[in-house]
């Protein structure tokens, strides 16, 4: 990933000690006044792809009218080729003394170029460089080169007087410029619409911007296909407010005495809302805590909601149900730490919970010798609609959702999953608190245990019997 080929690709001398202007005529030698030394720079490494170059007695540079100033910047192999080389020239207008002075800079690789007194160019034969210009009208010039070639870069600065396209050598005006050169991972840290990431391809390490919200370019500054502020706000509101569909399942769970399940649904609704508020690209972002924490809690709440709903449908013994709830929370936390975006993090717990549900319903059906749940109304008005809604949500999530339609397909996913919980959550088990006439409760040490009616109160009050005597 080298720089553009406009700089030439012919083998050149590695580092000449000085810059010479070609003499007139064949065999002639350059006069001594046309030989200028190359001024080295100091290198200060701060971090990966973060290097500052300092010049002696800088950062201001005085440019006398009779000769240019040449600086050498050394980029090391591997360490510097994956960043962005930035150069900034700033003209000190107060040093011009009302002269019409223009400062030209020419940045070339491996071989310096001399700037003439008349026509100013930054190319010669097969060698080309980057030209910078500062004057009283335009005081600052900036240049950025992503993924620069390693080796020695030469910056030649020359001050000339007059108005273009032809200039003349200044007589008594000494221009002063401020030079700032550094190597950074990304262009302007990718701005508000991007994130600078350190990447590796085979053995090549480099940094690049990951742009969001439709922005493009080296520094995420190209807004040709960018999303508008209104569109960003709409997508954020849809993803956040769609989680309010969990409110009906929470109310239904509390009314049915499923307090633990209601707590899990509330946890999921809260962290899913604020995770999507923090996860949005662009500037419509609101984070109440660290992004990684919000993402973990959102994923854990989503998986736990599926887990507790299916386990509640199995109608297991309270002790077994509590053990499965706790075991599921611990195993899901471990799985999310291992691979948060893995497919089996969603399918594995769901299939295991469905296996428990199928086993519990099969055992209960065999013991009762009829289908469980026993009422056709529950199958027709609860289980079938809930299963269809949940299946549709899974199909949308797995096969329809893309990066382009994420904001509204994922919002529909929120609403469908929350709606399916309201259908699938089983009704409250009815309990008959009436004690048979032949039984008398003991006031000290024992209590009567009455059978709980499991399905919609199908057994009448007269059918309640004392099942056992439990030690308190």
Swiss-Prot record:
Modified how: N-glycosylated.
Principal place of residence: membrane
Glycosylation sites: 92, 100
Disulfide bridges in this chain: 186-196, 190-209, 211-220
Domain EGF-like: residue ranges: 182-221
Alphabetized UniProt keyword annotations: Cell adhesion, Cell membrane, Cytoplasm, Disulfide bond, EGF-like domain, Endoplasmic reticulum, Glycoprotein, Growth regulation, Membrane, Mitochondrion, Nucleus, Transmembrane, Transmembrane helix
GO biological process, one term: cell adhesion
Transmembrane segments: 234-254, 258-277, 293-313, 316-336, 343-363, 380-400, 406-426
Stretches for region Disordered: 1-37
GO cellular component labels: endoplasmic reticulum; mitochondrion; nucleus; plasma membrane
Pfam family, one: DUF3522
Membrane disposition: Multi-pass membrane protein
UniProt subcellular location: Cell membrane; Cytoplasm; Nucleus; Mitochondrion
Residue intervals annotated with topology Cytoplasmic: 255-257, 314-315, 364-379, 427-472
Domain of life: Eukaryota
Extracellular side: 1-233, 278-292, 337-342, 401-405
Function: May function as a regulator of the EGFR pathway. Probable tumor suppressor which may function in cell growth, proliferation and adhesion.
Subunit description: May interact with EZR.
Record family assignment: Belongs to the TMEM8 family.
Protein name: Transmembrane protein 8B
Organism this protein belongs to: Bos taurus (Bovine)
């Amino acid at each position: 990933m080298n720089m553009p080929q406009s700089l030439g690709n012919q083998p050149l001398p590695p580092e000449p000690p000085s810059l010479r202007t070609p003499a007139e005529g064949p065999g002639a030698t350059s006069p001594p006044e046309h030989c200028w030394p190359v001024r080295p720079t100091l290198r200060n490494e701060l971090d990966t792809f973060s290097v500052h170059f300092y010049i002696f007695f800088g950062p201001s540079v005085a440019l006398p009218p009779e000769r240019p100033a040449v600086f050498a910047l050394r980029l090391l192999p591997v360490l510097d080729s994956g960043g962005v080389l930035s150069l900034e020239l700033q003209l000190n207008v107060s040093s011009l003394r009302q002269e019409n002075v223009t400062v030209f800079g020419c940045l070339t690789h491996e071989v310096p170029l001399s700037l003439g007194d008349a026509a100013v160019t930054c190319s010669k034969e097969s060698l080309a460089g980057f030209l910078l210009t500062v004057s009283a009208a335009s005081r600052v010039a900036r240049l950025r080169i992503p993924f620069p070639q390693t080796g020695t870069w030469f910056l030649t600065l020359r001050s000339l007087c007059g108005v273009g396209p032809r200039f003349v050598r200044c007589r008594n005006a000494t221009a002063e410029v401020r030079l700032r050169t550094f190597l950074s991972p990304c262009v302007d840290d990718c701005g508000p619409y991007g994130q600078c990431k350190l990447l590796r391809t085979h053995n090549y390490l480099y940094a690049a911007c990951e742009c969001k919200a439709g922005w493009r370019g080296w520094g995420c500054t190209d807004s040709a296909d960018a999303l508008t502020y209104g569109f960003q706000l709409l997508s954020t509101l849809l993803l956040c407010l769609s989680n309010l569909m969990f409110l009906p399942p929470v109310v239904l769970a509390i009314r049915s005495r499923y307090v633990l399940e209601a707590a899990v649904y509330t946890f999921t609704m809260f962290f899913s809302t604020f995770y999507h508020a923090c996860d949005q690209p662009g500037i419509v972002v609101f984070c109440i805590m660290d992004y990684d924490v919000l993402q973990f809690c959102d994923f854990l709440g989503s998986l736990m909601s599926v887990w507790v709903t299916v386990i509640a449908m199995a109608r297991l013994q309270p002790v077994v149900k509590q053990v499965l709830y706790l075991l599921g929370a611990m195993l899901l936390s471990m799985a999310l730490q291992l691979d948060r975006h893995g497919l089996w993090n969603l399918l594995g717990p769901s299939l295991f919970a469905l296996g428990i549900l199928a086993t519990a319903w099969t055992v209960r059906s065999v013991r009762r010798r009829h289908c469980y749940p026993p009422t056709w109304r529950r199958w027709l008005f609860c289980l079938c609609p809930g299963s269809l809604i949940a299946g549709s949500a899974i199909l949308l999530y797995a096969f329809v959702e893309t990066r382009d339609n994420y904001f509204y397909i994922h919002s529909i996913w929120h609403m469908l999953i929350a709606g399916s919980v309201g259908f699938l959550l089983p009704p409250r088990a009815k309990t008959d608190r009436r004690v048979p006439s032949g039984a008398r409760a003991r006031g000290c040490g024992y209590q009567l245990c009455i059978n709980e009616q499991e399905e919609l109160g199908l057994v009448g009050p007269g059918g309640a019997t004392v099942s056992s005597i439990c030690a308190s």
